[in-house]
Amino acid sequence: MSSGNSSLGIIVGIDDSPAAQVAVRWAARDAELRKIPLTLVHAVSPEVATWLEVPLPPGVLRWQQDHGRHLIDDALKVVEQASLRAGPPTVHSEIVPAAAVPTLVDMSKDAVLMVVGCLGSGRWPGRLLGSVSSGLLRHAHCPVVIIHDEDSVMPHPQQAPVLVGVDGSSASELATAIAFDEASRRNVDLVALHAWSDVDVSEWPGIDWPATQSMAEQVLAERLAGWQERYPNVAITRVVVRDQPARQLVQRSEEAQLVVVGSRGRGGYAGMLVGSVGETVAQLARTPVIVARESLT
């Protein structure tokens, strides 16, 4: 998969949440692997939602700008520390006086990837995705990476495979392209998972399960054949299971360094912004998740 000529490269949205620091580190390493720029963005909303019409004193706006510059400086240090062998990527930074979601959605038109933490500084107890990450999953013009605020518990996560969900949809085809590209750049294996039952049909009578399994395995092999030729250096493990895709992807994410899913699966309908599988995996997988949104421009 080509990284294209998107001028902003990889964009990472930053705030003072724990997940933002992890997001910066992941984005910096991915930008280094791709040899493309990294853009750090901190959005400062000039308005505060309140039922009282109280004007903000000038000191608050100045504090917001100073706080944003402090966050950018901290993020730049993370980028330097995250560097692998090739050296840190070219970094641009912006403090934008506007709401985060519309700002990042608009900037995503010129990005290869959009990277954000799962929960921002306005996190609510019990929530799994924040308003910014949820908004980008539905409206971004490029693939979105959701980062959780903890590092992998695996002893050698850099050696773990990339996991991709394959279901035959157009979004799944984009996810497959991204997954092969990431596995190739990271020099790791790829696990391609096809879970072919969104509902529990184990008790349905008259279904020839061995024949259905064999057919699903053949379909998966055909879906991957062209990509194997394009990326001969990537070793592939094909997994076909009779189970719900989201459950399998979340379970198997514990042994992967990255999960890639389509924004809408084969059950998605016209106008659907993000599918249930993509959203569930983004919420529950503890490893970074790329939701392969297609460009809307």
Curated annotation (Swiss-Prot):
Loss of function: phenotype: The deletion strain is hypervirulent compared to the wild-type strain in infection studies with outbred Hartley guinea pigs and with C3H/HeJ mice but not with C57BL/6 mice. No phenotype when grown in culture upon disruption, probably due to functional redundancy among paralogs.
Induction: A member of the dormancy regulon. Induced in response to reduced oxygen tension (hypoxia), low levels of nitric oxide (NO) and carbon monoxide (CO). It is hoped that this regulon will give insight into the latent, or dormant phase of infection. Induced in mouse lungs at the same time that adaptive host immunity induces bacterial growth arrest; induction is dependent on interferon gamma.
GO annotation, biological process: dormancy entry of symbiont in host; regulation of growth; response to hypoxia
GO cellular component, one term: cytosol
Coiled-coil region: none
Pfam family, one: Usp
Binding residue positions for ATP 2: G165, D198, G262, S263, R264, G265, R266, G267, G268, S276, V277, G278
Statement: the UniProt record of this protein carries the keyword ATP-binding: yes
The keyword Amino-acid biosynthesis appears for this protein: no
Domain of life (superkingdom): Bacteria
Outcome following mutation: G117A: Reduces ATP-binding; M.tuberculosis overexpressing this protein grows normally
Gene Ontology MF: a single term: ATP binding
Further information: Was identified as a high-confidence drug target.
Subunit structure: Homodimer.
Family of this protein: Belongs to the universal stress protein A family.
Stated role: May play a role in the establishment of a persistent infection (latency) in the host, as strains without this gene are hypervirulent.
Entry-linked PANTHER family: STRESS RESPONSE PROTEIN NHAX, UNIVERSAL STRESS PROTEIN RV2623
Record's protein name: Universal stress protein Rv2623
Species the sequence originates in: Mycobacterium tuberculosis (strain ATCC 25618 / H37Rv)
